[in-house]
């Protein structure tokens, strides 16, 4: 299994918060800011953790209003 890399565009104000949330789930993923002005991020998801990350993103969308749009780089 390999690390899954997915790119998203979120609201600029949510980058720091999402990064903090991802870091709190020790080792499931790394968030990298690709373009801070366009608010494009890359999630590097650890093998076997994809489902957890997708569930987390769905929960953040519902509970915190963090909207992410998949971006093709």
Q: Which stretches of residues belong to each language-model region?
A:
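N-terminal intrinsically disordered, cationic/polar leader segments
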Residues: 3-24, 28-73
């Amino acid at each position: 299994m390999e690390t899954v890399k997915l790119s998203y565009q979120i609201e600029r104000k949510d980058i720091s918060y999402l990064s903090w949330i991802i870091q709190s789930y020790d080792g499931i993923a790394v968030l990298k800011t690709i373009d801070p002005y366009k608010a494009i991020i890359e999630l590097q998801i650890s093998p076997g953790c994809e489902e957890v990350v997708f569930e987390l993103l769905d929960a953040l969308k519902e509970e915190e209003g963090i909207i992410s749009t998949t971006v093709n780089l």
